[in-house]
Swiss-Prot record:
<feature type="modified residue" description="N6-succinyllysine">
    <location>
        <position position="7"/>
    </location>
</feature>
<feature type="modified residue" description="Phosphoserine">
    <location>
        <position position="138"/>
    </location>
</feature>
<dbReference type="InterPro" id="IPR000971">
    <property type="entry name" value="Globin"/>
</dbReference>
<dbReference type="GO" id="GO:0005833">
    <property type="term" value="C:hemoglobin complex"/>
</dbReference>
<protein>
    <recommendedName>
        <fullName>Hemoglobin subunit alpha</fullName>
    </recommendedName>
</protein>
<dbReference type="GO" id="GO:0020037">
    <property type="term" value="F:heme binding"/>
</dbReference>
<dbReference type="GO" id="GO:0042744">
    <property type="term" value="P:hydrogen peroxide catabolic process"/>
</dbReference>
<feature type="modified residue" description="Phosphothreonine">
    <location>
        <position position="137"/>
    </location>
</feature>
<keyword id="KW-0007">Acetylation</keyword>
<dbReference type="GO" id="GO:0005506">
    <property type="term" value="F:iron ion binding"/>
</dbReference>
<dbReference type="InterPro" id="IPR050056">
    <property type="entry name" value="Hemoglobin_oxygen_transport"/>
</dbReference>
<feature type="modified residue" description="N6-succinyllysine">
    <location>
        <position position="40"/>
    </location>
</feature>
<dbReference type="InterPro" id="IPR009050">
    <property type="entry name" value="Globin-like_sf"/>
</dbReference>
<feature type="binding site" description="proximal binding residue">
    <location>
        <position position="87"/>
    </location>
    <ligand>
        <name>heme b</name>
    </ligand>
</feature>
<dbReference type="Pfam" id="PF00042">
    <property type="entry name" value="Globin"/>
</dbReference>
<comment type="subunit">
    <text>Heterotetramer of two alpha chains and two beta chains.</text>
</comment>
<feature type="domain" description="Globin">
    <location>
        <begin position="1"/>
        <end position="141"/>
    </location>
</feature>
Amino acid sequence: MLTDAEKKEVTALWGKAAGHGEEYGAEALERLFQAFPTTKTYFSHFDLSHGSAQIKAHGKKVADALSTAAGHFDDMDSALSALSDLHAHKLRVDPVNFKLLAHCILVVLARHCPGEFTPSAHAAMDKFLSKVATVLTSKYR
């Protein structure tokens, strides 16, 4: 559960980043594929080259999902229910990959929003992304 102060930190940081969702989401995915090559197996049908339209489009989906989550702190389970079903039952994504992507998202935010990426914002965003990962893996059980 995020505190009110953490919600404010996430809202402020994600508010700045969300306007660059496609760019930041694509960069996070590219970092994911470079740092953790086994994650590419879920995207074998994608053009994984730098700047590909498919990576940008999926990056935007990731960013949009995070915007949805940030808009529903107290009802994230319902807000992300369909996405959780998709990843658990159709795509069958290994749950560890959400944590790996969360790490890459933090790196991208630190790179692009250094002034806003304070230690407290970092901690709040990490907690938020962990909550998102928990919600997305809740249907695996």
